[in-house]
């Protein structure tokens, strides 16, 4: 393929990527920084996750996805949302490696020992003992 010619199918035995998440482009109500936790809703498809344990959580804004779906979307504000894989995420509170992560409001995630069904964003890949910061998590429905 090229910028003017596209192929519909790729046949390969294996492929590799420098980055580690699969993401999709959604229309957002504003621009969001990488690591922001977002939910379905607002005036467009995606908005910042504003409530704790949000059951409408969609994922985390990705900085550099290895594979990007729906890249042809044209919108005033495009949100590249990590759907699965490793992604840096804004967190608040103490986090233990392996903890299930849910929305904490204000675009952050937090650890939860007993999350409600449909609220888990992913699992923490590292410990964190600060008030707020960025850690790597594995995004995906657990």
Residue locations for each model-derived region?
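Extracellular glycan-interaction patches encoded by glycine-rich segments
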Residues: 1-3
């Amino acid at each position: 393929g090229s910028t003017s010619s596209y192929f519909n199918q790729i046949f390969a035995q294996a492929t590799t990527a420098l980055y580690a998440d699969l993401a999709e482009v959604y229309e957002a109500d504003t621009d969001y920084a990488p690591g922001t936790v977002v939910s379905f809703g607002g005036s467009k498809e995606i908005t910042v996750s504003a409530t704790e344990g949000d059951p409408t959580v969609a994922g985390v804004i990705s900085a550099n996805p290895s594979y990007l779906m729906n890249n042809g979307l044209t919108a005033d504000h495009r949100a590249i949302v990590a759907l699965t894989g490793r992604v840096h995420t804004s967190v608040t509170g103490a986090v233990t490696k392996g903890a299930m992560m849910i929305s904490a409001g204000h675009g952050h995630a937090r650890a939860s020992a007993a999350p409600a069904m449909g609220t888990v964003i992913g699992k923490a890949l590292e410990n964190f003992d600060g008030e707020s910061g960025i850690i790597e998590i594995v995004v995906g429905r657990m």
